[in-house]
């Protein structure tokens, strides 16, 4: 399975090695994610209840507090969980959470970069990006939702640039 997902390279008589992050596959994964998530957000746009809005805002605030406290145990894993919960929320509210779970499971190369980005300065924009998505969801047009989501999901390019400058051997452009 990992070989099919291009997560490992199997070399007969030599062994199995972690495959470099395939930037072309990562771009495809990210486009599929953007397309699906944009559709879900637009189905929900303008229909979020005050209680649901508060749940979104609570998630953002919890993330902000965790982000500021480097001493928190399991901080990186918890931040990733909060990020996933923020994005999954719109799928849940549309009754399509299984679609989110399936999508997340298919994002092999993107997930590797997401985990790296939690340890960089680029990560500092998550709360403001999530707030922009929420505001577009509450009060914006389809174009506003699209722009906020595109801005947020394209952050991975900065993470790739940072990681690639330090470890170019971790990436391939195939």
Spell out what each predicted region is.
Residues 1, 11-12, 27, 61-62, ...:
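Short, flexible segments with low predicted structural confidence
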């Amino acid at each position: 399975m990992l070989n099919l997902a291009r997560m490992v390279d199997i070399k007969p008589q030599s062994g199995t090695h972690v495959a470099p992050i395939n930037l072309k596959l990562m771009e495809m994964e990210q486009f599929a994610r953007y397309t699906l998530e944009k559709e879900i957000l637009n189905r929900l746009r303008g229909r979020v209840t005050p209680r649901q809005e508060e749940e979104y805002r609570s998630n953002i605030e919890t993330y902000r507090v965790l982000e500021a406290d480097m001493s928190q145990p399991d901080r990186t894993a918890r931040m990733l969980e909060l990020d996933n919960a923020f994005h999954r929320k719109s799928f849940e509210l549309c009754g399509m959470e299984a679609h989110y779970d399936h999508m997340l499971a298919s994002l092999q190369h993107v997930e590797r970069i997401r985990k790296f980005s939690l340890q960089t300065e680029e990560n500092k924009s998550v709360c403001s990006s999530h707030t922009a998505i929420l505001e577009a969801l509450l009060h914006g047009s389809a174009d506003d939702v699209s722009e906020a989501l595109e801005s947020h999901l394209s952050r991975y390019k900065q993470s790739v640039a940072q990681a690639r400058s330090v470890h170019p051997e971790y990436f391939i452009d195939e």
